[in-house]
C-alpha cells in the first residue's frame, strides 16, 4: 500500500487549551474557569501547609531549647557527666537547627508562594473579567437573535395563513383578510430587518469572542504551566529543607554516640573512689569497759578505739543479672 503524502494527511491538533475548550453554548468556558479557581484553592492550601509546617518546627525548636536548659546529670561526674553535657549541647544545636528550618520554610517557601500566587491571581482576574464581560454581551445578543427570529417566524407563518385563507373567503371577509395580510407584511418587513441586524451584530461579536477566547485560553495555559512548574519546584525545595534538618539531627546524634564511646564505666568508678573514697579501714565495734574495776584512767575525757580496725579487702560480688 503506497504511503499517504504528507499534504493529504489530516493536520495534527496540538494538545492545548485553545484547541480543546470550545463546543456548543460555549461549553468550554466553565471547565476552564473552574480549573483556574481550583488552582487558587491549591495554592491557598499549600500556603496553609507551609505555615503550619513552619509553626510545628518553631514549637519543636522552642521545646528542644527549653529542654536543653534544664539540668541533666548535674550531680554526675566523670566521663558520663561529659557525655551528658554533650547531650545537652547537641540538643541545643538541634533546637537551633529546627529554628533555622522554620525560618527557611517561611522565607524560602511560604513568602515566595504568597508573592507568586498574588501575581497569578491578578493576571487571572484581568483575563477572566474581560472574558466574562464579553461572554455576557454575546449571551444577551444571542437571546436578542432568538427573540427576533421567533417574531419574524411568527409573521411569516401568519402571512402564509392569510394567503391560504384568501382563496377561501369572499366579500367582506376577503377584504378583512387582505387588510391583515398587508399589515402583517409591513410588520414582517420590520421584524425581518430586526432579525437580520441582530444576526449581523451577533456574528461580529462571535468573531470577536472567538479571537479573545482563543487568546484567553493561551494565557490561561501559560498561567497553569507557570503554576505547575512553580509548585513542583517549591515542593522540591520543601523536601530538601526537610531532609537538611534530618541530616543535622543525625550529625548531632552521631556526636552523642561518639561521646558515649568515650564513656568508661571502670574509669568513672575509679575516679569516684579516688575523689570521694573515705578509706579502707573498717572500725572494730566498741568493747565493754568496766569502769569500776579501773580498766580505764578516771581522768580520761573520752574513750578512743581509733587503733582498733580491720582493712577492707573484699572480693567483688557481681550481680548475676
Give the label of every model feature segment:
Residues 2-31, 35-42, 49-52, 56-67, ...:
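Membrane-associated scaffolding surfaces of BAR-superfamily helical dimers
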Amino acid at each position: 500500500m503506497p504511503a499517504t503524502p504528507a499534504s493529504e494527511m489530516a493536520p495534527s491538533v496540538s494538545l492545548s487549551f485553545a484547541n480543546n475548550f470550545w463546543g456548543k453554548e460555549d461549553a468550554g468556558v466553565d471547565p476552564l474557569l473552574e480549573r483556574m479557581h481550583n488552582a487558587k484553592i491549591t495554592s491557598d492550601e499549600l500556603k496553609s501547609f507551609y505555615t503550619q509546617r513552619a509553626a510545628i518546627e518553631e514549637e519543636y525548636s522552642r521545646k528542644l531549647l527549653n529542654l536543653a536548659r534544664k539540668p541533666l546529670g548535674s550531680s554526675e561526674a566523670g566521663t558520663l557527666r561529659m557525655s551528658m553535657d554533650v547531650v545537652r549541647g547537641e540538643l541545643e544545636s538541634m533546637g537551633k537547627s529546627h529554628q533555622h528550618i522554620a525560618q527557611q520554610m517561611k522565607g524560602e517557601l511560604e513568602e515566595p508562594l504568597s508573592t507568586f500566587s498574588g501575581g497569578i491571581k491578578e493576571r487571572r482576574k484581568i483575563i477572566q473579567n474581560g472574558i466574562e464581560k464579553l461572554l455576557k454581551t454575546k449571551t444577551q445578543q444571542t437571546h436578542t437573535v432568538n427573540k427576533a427570529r421567533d417574531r419574524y417566524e411568527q409573521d411569516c407563518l401568519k402571512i402564509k395563513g392569510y394567503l391560504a385563507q384568501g382563496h377561501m373567503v369572499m366579500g367582506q371577509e376577503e377584504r378583512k383578510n387582505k387588510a391583515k395580510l398587508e399589515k402583517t407584511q409591513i410588520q414582517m418587513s420590520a421584524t425581518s430587518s430586526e432579525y437580520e441586524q441582530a444576526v449581523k451584530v451577533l456574528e461580529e461579536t462571535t468573531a470577536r469572542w472567538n479571537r479573545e477566547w482563543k487568546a484567553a485560553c493561551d494565557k490561561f495555559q501559560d498561567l497553569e504551566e507557570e503554576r505547575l512548574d512553580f509548585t513542583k519546584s517549591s515542593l522540591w525545595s520543601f523536601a530538601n529543607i526537610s531532609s537538611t534538618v534530618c541530616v543535622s539531627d543525625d550529625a548531632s546524634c552521631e556526636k552523642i554516640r561518639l561521646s558515649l564511646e568515650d564513656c568508661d564505666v571502670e574509669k568513672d568508678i575509679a575516679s569516684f573512689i579516688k575523689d570521694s573514697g573515705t578509706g579502707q579501714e573498717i572500725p572494730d565495734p566498741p568493747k565493754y569497759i568496766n569502769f569500776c574495776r579501773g580498766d580505764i584512767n578516771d581522768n580520761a575525757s573520752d574513750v578512743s578505739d581509733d587503733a582498733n580496725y580491720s582493712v577492707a579487702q573484699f572480693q567483688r560480688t557481681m550481680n548475676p543479672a
